[in-house]
Amino acid sequence: MLSAIQREKLTQFAQALIDQEAARVILPAEQPQSGFWFGGGNLCKSQDGGLYLCGRFRSAGDSRTGLEAGARGRELVIWRSTDRGQRFERVLSFSKADLSLPDRPVLSIEGSALHSTRNGIELFVSSEKDNIGYPEAWRSFQKEGTGVWTIERLTASTVKGLAEAPIDTVLTCRDPRWLHVKDPVVHDMSNGDLMLAFCTHPYSWTSSNSGYAIRAQGSARFQPAVYDFFPRGFTWDVAMSRITSLVNVPGCGVFADTPGLLLAFYDGGECVRQLEEHGGAVHRPRGYSCEELGGAAVLLESAPSRNERLSTNLPLFLSPYGTGCSRYVDVLQAPEGFYATWQQSQPDFSQALVMNFLSWEKANEILT
């Protein structure tokens, strides 16, 4: 799909966006210790030029303690910045009870995504819910007190109006291979359709995978989802390949004559559980659930199953601190440049949300 020079330039562009040394903390975790973070959301440009940011506060704990007592994914927050991300102020928040359906209480809030529309704003949010259950033939595999992940949507004319918006389930799956769906990612396609990418887990929780669904322009509903378009890797990302952001590859430099490409950022790891490293092995971050490492790939927008990894044998993005975790990248392409945010492991092993900005001038320089 890519020539050698295109691979080199696009990799440099991705690394300039996710610059671990240049990034600054915009939202720290609530406690300076492992298991605490803020993130799993995205940035969205408002009509007046401001930035909205959504994400969840995550506390160490076990969601199986129930709706009221469970501390884990306990709050979704929307923030606003009027100075290009220098400062953010809280606009709106949702508790687990706020996002619960009458017969499906939320056990843990997961990833979310804001999406600007012609009529206002959409908020896609995923959560673990009680009272869904595994399919009958697989029920014995469900651990006591756990739920199933689904994705919902709230719509309103303004961000503050989301507080009173009805909650509509847009994506759920009963196939045991992709039973849990979470962590929505929104991408406005060049033809006016909306691509909703998401993460899946099987009934057995042995891997993390990526799927997508298309909502045609003018339609209120998504077409049937595609669950197997981006296979897991063979090396550092053999257990997990979760897409977290889709960005149009700028049509400049070596890509001036190659339209319709998307740069995909994804989270990966060697195993869902933390592996015990052999004493003679090369010591390195390996990635596991909640401490994933970062990679990148390129997709053809019109046929996403045509894709090519930029991070084939090693991750591209590692935090210089803590466990090395660098995950949940989101990149907003704006008239003034590119805003990149991600969760970065800190020296205290919490994960802060960090930001880096790359100007169009610098992007053009890299890609030329």
Regions found by a protein language model. Give the residues of each.
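Beta-rich carbohydrate-recognition and catalytic domains
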Residues: 1-107, 115-183, 187-322, 334-368
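Short glycine-rich, acidic/polar surface loops and turns
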Residues: 326-329
